[in-house]
């Protein structure tokens, strides 16, 4: 009699979980574009649809640091964003990668149970997170809202979370391009960047009305100010609002990431089954893609959240103050760290602040580079892309490294892959730091995530066969 596995506990829930059926035939590229566009439209509508029953508040957002990375929008149906999906996915990938759960992803039955377990855990996280948000007073004191509104708020968040899970599954199963997670993150970040560049919203800063969008502000200042030189300077360097230098910095980061995406080490391989058949196995500079910055951002965001919650309740406690002291930014209700451990984990506000506090800048750079390098090296072990995994994949395909026997192939890959992962992770961290210091729109982390995801989508589209000519033209 075989022992009961963890995944077997999921079987009773399979009939009750909604599921997107696997397509019976290959979906044409144009239909994939249509489904991807429809998914995106639903996400955008949900991002703007306010929750019914909330008490509006201009107080500091304790989840501010997580919003962009988690495709979340405060006070809307997309309040939870992709948090339940990404948290569930990372937990199960960690459990499978460290063999804490018994699963063979080569078997269809195990693969389906594994995906169902991920979905079930994401639903549980949605219910738990929604309940915590409502009962901790994020939308107003529960006693003021009443039992009916409290239940309605939780229901709205859980149903919206379920829709997001199904939209992600729709794309993952081949009806669309890529995954819902990547699509929603990139859309959220690009929407933020475009808004900061072209927003027509007028803000009174004490010097008269100014437009929030950097490009709109440039034309407005040139048309309304007599001194054109001063108008240009103001448009390029104005404080507390997006400026042209921020926009140019964003474009520089976009170009740098796309350029570095092309860096790779080509490992020559040959077939052990067909004489004369040769090829190459590419090891990219960004071997783990954007995972290091996502994991680092998730770590920092959660540390910031805990510190902010502790400081709001125990602001006089010495240990809490050593952890982090929070004060409101000038002209906003949003809190930012001004001292303590979390201050050194957060980026300088701008290049001037970086020069004025070199210790903060040095510690932040060291933290970013180290965290991204460590996360990148760790991720290859749990994601099925370690030297041992790659050696097994090559062996299964009947390939060996040119000049190496099967037995020595693992040693050579062990010399190359961890180094590439750590160096690539550090490069991602360095780009994020540079992006933050230059003041790129949408934060350094957000800009990097957007570029790597968009580049990934471009590659997916190219693989579909419709954009091969375009790719060749752009890549030269």
From Swiss-Prot:
Which stretches face the Lumenal side?
Answer: 55-76, 141-146, 268-361, 435-440
The record's subcellular locations are: Endoplasmic reticulum membrane
Q: Which Pfam families match?
A: Plug_translocon, SecY
User: Where does the chain cross the membrane?
Assistant: 34-54, 77-97, 120-140, 147-167, 247-267, 362-382, 416-434, 441-458
Which terms does the UniProt entry file under GO BP? Answer: misfolded protein transport; post-translational protein targeting to membrane, translocation; retrograde protein transport, ER to cytosol; SRP-dependent cotranslational protein targeting to membrane, translocation
Give the record's keywords alphabetically. Answer: Endoplasmic reticulum, Membrane, Protein transport, Translocation, Transmembrane, Transmembrane helix, Transport
Membrane side Cytoplasmic: which residues? 1-33, 98-119, 168-246, 383-415, 459-476
Q: How does it sit in the membrane?
A: Multi-pass membrane protein
Q: Which GO terms describe its molecular function?
A: peptide transmembrane transporter activity; protein transmembrane transporter activity; protein-transporting ATPase activity; ribosome binding; signal sequence binding
Xref: PROSITE patterns? SECY_1, SECY_2
Give any Gene Ontology cellular component. fungal-type vacuole
The answer, when asked if Metal-binding is one of the entry's keywords, is no
Q: Which InterPro entries match?
A: SecY/SEC61-alpha, SecY_CS, SecY_dom_sf, Translocon_Sec61/SecY_plug_dom
Main location per the UniProt record:
endoplasmic reticulum
The text of the family note is: Belongs to the SecY/SEC61-alpha family.
Q: What role is this protein assigned?
A: Appears to play a crucial role in the insertion of secretory and membrane polypeptides into the ER. It is required for assembly of membrane and secretory proteins and is essential for cell growth. It interacts with other membrane proteins required for protein translocation. Upon binding to SEC62/63 complex, secretory precursor polypeptides may engage SEC61 to begin membrane penetration event. A cycle of assembly and disassembly of SEC62/63 from SEC61 may govern the activity of the translocase.
The UniProt subunit note reads as follows: Heterotrimeric complex composed of SEC61-alpha, SEC61-beta and SEC61-gamma.
Protein name as annotated: Protein transport protein SEC61 subunit alpha
Identify the species of origin.
Neurospora crassa (strain ATCC 24698 / 74-OR23-1A / CBS 708.71 / DSM 1257 / FGSC 987)
């Amino acid at each position: 009699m075989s022992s009961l596995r963890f995944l077997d506990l999921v079987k009773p829930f399979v009939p009750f979980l909604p599921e997107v059926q696997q397509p019976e035939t290959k979906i044409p590229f144009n239909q994939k574009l249509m489904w991807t566009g429809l998914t995106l439209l639903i996400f955008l509508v949900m991002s703007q649809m306010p929750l019914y029953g909330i008490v509006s508040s201009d107080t500091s957002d304790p989840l501010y640091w997580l919003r962009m990375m988690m495709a979340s929008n405060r006070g809307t149906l997309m309040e939870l964003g992709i948090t339940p999906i990404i948290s569930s996915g990372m937990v199960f990938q960690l459990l499978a990668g460290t063999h804490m759960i018994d699963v063979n992803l080569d078997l269809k039955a195990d693969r389906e149970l594994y995906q169902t377990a991920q979905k079930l855990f994401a639903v549980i996280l949605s219910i738990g997170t929604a309940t915590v948000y409502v009962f901790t007073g994020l939308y107003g004191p529960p006693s003021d809202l009443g039992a009916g509104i409290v239940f309605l708020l939780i229901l709205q968040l859980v149903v919206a979370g379920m829709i997001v899970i199904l939209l992600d599954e729709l794309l993952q199963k081949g009806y669309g391009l890529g995954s819902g997670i990547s699509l929603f993150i990139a859309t959220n970040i690009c929407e933020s960047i475009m808004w900061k560049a072209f927003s027509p919203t007028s803000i009174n800063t004490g010097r008269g009305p100014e437009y929030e969008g950097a490009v709109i502000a440039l034309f407005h200042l040139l048309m309304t100010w007599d001194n054109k030189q001063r108008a240009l300077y103001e448009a390029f360097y104005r404080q507390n609002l997006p400026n042209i230098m921020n926009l140019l910095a964003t474009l520089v980061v976009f170009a740098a990431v796309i350029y570095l995406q092309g860096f790779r080490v080509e490992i020559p391989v040959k077939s052990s089954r067909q004489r004369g058949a040769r090829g190459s196995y590419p090891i990219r500079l960004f071997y783990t893609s954007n995972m290091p910055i996502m994991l680092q951002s998730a770590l920092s965001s959660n540390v910031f959240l805990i510190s902010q919650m502790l400081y709001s309740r125990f602001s006089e406690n010495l240990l809490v103050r050593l952890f982090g002291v929070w004060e409101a930014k000038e002209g906003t209700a949003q809190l930012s760290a001004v001292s303590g451990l979390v201050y050194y984990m957060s980026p300088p506000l701008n290049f001037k602040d970086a020069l004025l506090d070199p210790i903060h800048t040095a510690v932040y750079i060291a933290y970013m580079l180290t965290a991204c390098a460590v996360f990148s090296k760790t991720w290859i072990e749990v994601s099925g892309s370690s030297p041992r995994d790659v050696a097994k994949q090559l062996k299964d395909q009947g390939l060996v490294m040119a000049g190496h026997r099967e037995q020595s192939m693992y040693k050579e890959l062990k010399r190359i892959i961890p180094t590439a992962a750590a160096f690539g992770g550090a490069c991602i961290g360095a780009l994020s730091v540079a992006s933050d210091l230059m003041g790129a729109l949408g934060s350094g982390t957000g800009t990097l995530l957007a570029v790597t995801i968009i580049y990934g989508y471009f590659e997916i589209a190219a693989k579909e066969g419709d954009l091969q000519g375009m790719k060749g033209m752009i890549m030269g």
